[in-house]
């Protein structure tokens, strides 16, 4: 009897144990990452040929204690390697694990290699050559603490390499994991199986091989026992011949069918090639089809299984499309596949909840480093009275109501950018802004007392409902998370896409960027203030301080300002402002852009302006500014400097976003200035619920 070890992906150990026992293995013992078992020589070959779940089959050769590199060398050399290798066999060493002595796996592999080679030269035998790419024998050494375990890898290449894969699509799953997913899906061979996001077809191919009794090792060309001196070629040929016979019989007798589709024509072509190479191409129908086009290919079949490994996102900007995808799949299952089963394998359990289905079973497994879950669902048969469940129904109803109200208003106003929803319902704490045919959803970060999983699920529901109510394509929705801003964080760069969208605001054309920054380049709540500036600017010299992307300057220029001066500390935003001005034909010497610390520039400037707009930050301690700035504390000093630049009869429009801001009217009077609050006049319909989003003042000479 041979003592053997079969490795597998985390979470599949018990499934592998059952498989090995069915092959005839005895004394099976599950450990993390695999199964120890015993069997005769025939079982060695059967496990290699027939295991769908094992990553590798190892033949343990011994263990040794490693307190020094010499211990490792002597421990390896103690094994009778000359009786292990066929003459002329090449070999390679795979070494994993470190300890205080062996701190580099390459060094460990070198010591093992030296010990094996020296075992031959000491007996005056030809030394075996190393072949890292295609060795006849693979030696595996695993070092854990002070113990090194040495084994022959009888698999050669990993057993997931069945020999049928042409080229993988994006983010494939290994064939061994795919087989486990099929086994756990609840699908019964002989019934229909469909994968609507099949990629290169791995799940369907593994299922078809299982259903037709086709051994997973049948198409492999190389094995790790080819240079093993104890290899029994006669038994191996018997095992191989039996597998070939069973495969022919299984294919001839199988009558059901498999269906796969994917939106990518290139991966569908690969899937067809893979299925043909696997010998089961005639059983699988592959189509280029988006999930939105999914229909039941066998509507008269009482039951079948939909099985898939849908995409998941690691980046925030991919989530809206994925949420929409899962929501859509859930609706299609209910409408088209009543009575069928659904099984999905995913690294994102939150996305699976968007199906709006209740799972009957779930399994955990690893896909490489990713923690994944497989959930099985039974889809109830629909009845004429069945009504689809609405996701986030209260939110959807409010958004629908707001859409009806604001869409017509915005069209009449001549604006393309407006707020559709502003945390109207406390439990749905987001802002939804429309930018032409795009939508930005800003999640206000939930307090730490709220369960993170529940908050994420609520956000997913919001996104699904937003896409549904507004009827937009998922890739037209941008998701952002907004936390309380500190200093310059409001200008934090989020991405590098550099994609700008042209929008209109009254008679102005403006560039917005929906993805690269937390803000888009256009503060929607200041829309009316910008229009007022345009109406006030004819024939005047206009100054815009803390100008951001210069949208107020554009309105002033279009309103007939004699000159405009735009000042901001950020080169990025000044370049953006220049693009906005150019887009509206506002170029030349009359339109200056100045990169400077606005407060420092203000103290030193000696020019005169008729109309000044200033929208400073609530607080700033930027390293590029000379002093920290607090708008409540410092606004009077700001007005003192502004007065010096204000031409007789001129006006300052002063705005800020500090909640509870109190204008120092007495202090202003001492400066010879007076203030008129116009906050309510600058709040449009879409910000009527948020009266404190900003405050705005007109300041003139007393």
UniProtKB/Swiss-Prot annotation:
Designated name of the protein: Ribosomal RNA large subunit methyltransferase K/L
Pfam families: Methyltrans_SAM, RlmL_1st, THUMP, UPF0020
Organism field: Escherichia coli O157:H7
Source organism phylogeny: Bacteria, Pseudomonadati, Pseudomonadota, Gammaproteobacteria, Enterobacterales
Family: Belongs to the methyltransferase superfamily. RlmKL family.
NCBIfam families: PRK11783.1
Catalysed transformations (reactions): guanosine(2445) in 23S rRNA + S-adenosyl-L-methionine = N(2)-methylguanosine(2445) in 23S rRNA + S-adenosyl-L-homocysteine + H(+); guanosine(2069) in 23S rRNA + S-adenosyl-L-methionine = N(2)-methylguanosine(2069) in 23S rRNA + S-adenosyl-L-homocysteine + H(+)
Tagged with keyword Aminoacyl-tRNA synthetase: no
Subcellular location: Cytoplasm
InterPro entries: 23SrRNA_methyltr_KL, DNA_methylase_N6_adenine_CS, RlmKL-like_Mtase, RlmKL-like_Mtase_CS, RlmL_1st, SAM-dep_methyl-trfase, SAM-dependent_MTases_sf, THUMP_dom
UniProt-listed PROSITE patterns: THUMP, UPF0020
A GO term, aspect molecular function: RNA binding
Stretches assigned to the THUMP domain: 43-154
Keyword annotations from UniProtKB, A to Z: Cytoplasm, Methyltransferase, RNA-binding, rRNA processing, S-adenosyl-L-methionine, Transferase
Top enzyme class: transferase
The keyword Zinc appears for this protein: no
A Gene Ontology term for the protein's cellular component: cytoplasm
Enzyme Commission no: 2.1.1.173, 2.1.1.264
Function description: Specifically methylates the guanine in position 2445 (m2G2445) and the guanine in position 2069 (m7G2069) of 23S rRNA.
